[in-house]
């Protein structure tokens, strides 16, 4: 009797491929935060070009003084006419911006105003809608001036302005290191989130507790970076003081750029008396 050959054919129901439609779900906790972090890192890697708002270059310290004068004046003034004139001054400065930079200014300014209004909102129940609108107007003007300065001033000019105003070297060094290593810490946070996503097999039960652990790890990493950087700077002979380079001489155009803020301050002083 010959041995029978076993039947090795695969059944037909195993050969048919069935595709199960997967319902569209919302973005997960990891993916959503990683997308926002990648967008932030791309902006830090390729910052937007600074807009030239005038035909001559104003000294960095004069631009910084103008910003401080306007912000302090907005904080001290309670006159609606004076605040309206300051709003017109900012509006006239915005007219010199290109359309692309103006759209970027409006987007960042509206987001910052919306976040600031969350802190001003309790005044509605304490003092009424009039106080809320008044403080909202002052906060919006402060943020508009700060946003305009950020849009038209590179970071190196900010450091040069602080040096020209004789700010402490420790403050300038801390600010420069913080901006320089911000992208490095962001990349470390992104890599940590990707590693946790690969090791996570279930939905995150406590996302806010996990966020606290991530930022705690980020703080320890920044502390390690700071110690390594300080040791490297000491090895290269840094003694905590910057060599002050000879800056350019002040010109009458610098004082002319500062004149609108001075005129508004004079009106504010004489209006009160």
From Swiss-Prot:
What family does the database annotate? Belongs to the CbiQ family.
Q: Which organism is it from?
A: Lactiplantibacillus plantarum (strain ATCC BAA-793 / NCIMB 8826 / WCFS1) (Lactobacillus plantarum)
> Does Transmembrane helix show up as a keyword for this record?
yes
Identification of the protein by name: Nickel permease LarQ
* Lineage, highest ranks first: Bacteria, Bacillati, Bacillota, Bacilli, Lactobacillales
Q: How does it sit in the membrane?
A: Multi-pass membrane protein
Q: Which Pfam families match?
A: CbiQ
Please list the GO biological process terms of this entry: nickel cation transport
- UniProt KW Acetylation keyword: no
| Induction and repression of expression | Induced by L-lactate but not by a racemic mixture of DL-lactate. Makes part of the larR(MN)QO operon.
Give me the segments passing through the membrane: 64-84, 117-137, 159-179, 210-230, 251-271
| Physiological role | Probable transmembrane component of the energy-coupling factor (ECF) transporter complex LarMNQO involved in nickel import.
Q: How does it assemble?
A: May form an energy-coupling factor (ECF) transporter complex composed of an ATP-binding protein (A component, LarO), a transmembrane protein (T component, LarQ) and a fused possible substrate-capture protein (S component, LarMN) of unknown stoichiometry.
> Keywords, A to Z?
Cell membrane, Ion transport, Membrane, Nickel, Nickel transport, Transmembrane, Transmembrane helix, Transport
The protein's matches in CDD domains, at most eight in alphabetical order, are given as: EcfT
The record ties this protein, via InterPro entries, to: ABC/ECF_trnsptr_transmembrane, ECF_transporter_component
Give the superkingdom in one word: Bacteria
Q: Where in the cell is it found?
A: Cell membrane
Coiled-coil region? none
